[in-house]
Amino acid sequence: KDNNNLGAIVKLLDDESLTRAVGLFLPLQRENRVQAIKTFVHQNHVMVVKLNGDVVGMVVLSPWYGDEGIRIAHHYELGYLLRQDQWNKGIMTSAIQQIISILPPKITIHAECKQSNYRSQRVLIKCGFIYDKGDLWQRIIK
């Protein structure tokens, strides 16, 4: 929740192909877009991924809600995105592994990944996630 990175996050999310790929729909008008991103950062655990001081990606842990729309304690949804010029370098795998290593025990992390997104599936597998059903994967922190 570092507001010092807000400008860098806004710049990262200016890449529409990136935001569309992860299902993040933001307002087109700049002022509304910045406010929406600010709200998103405030409501979730957002960690930026930096390379040589530049923000090249982000990892998000969000509260997980069950089928009835009720928040489930100790369950989180993992979301992540990385600038396309940084793909296939192990950067996101490393970032997620670092985050998982500092999480407390007895947490379940869910991730939604399109079945056609093989790169992202490989990241999840390398980070210990197991395929659940449909587009859902999960990892239990013991």
Annotated model-derived regions:
Residues 17-37:
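Conserved GNAT-fold acetyl-CoA-binding loop/helix
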Residues 38-43:
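Short loop/turn motifs at secondary-structure junctions and domain boundaries
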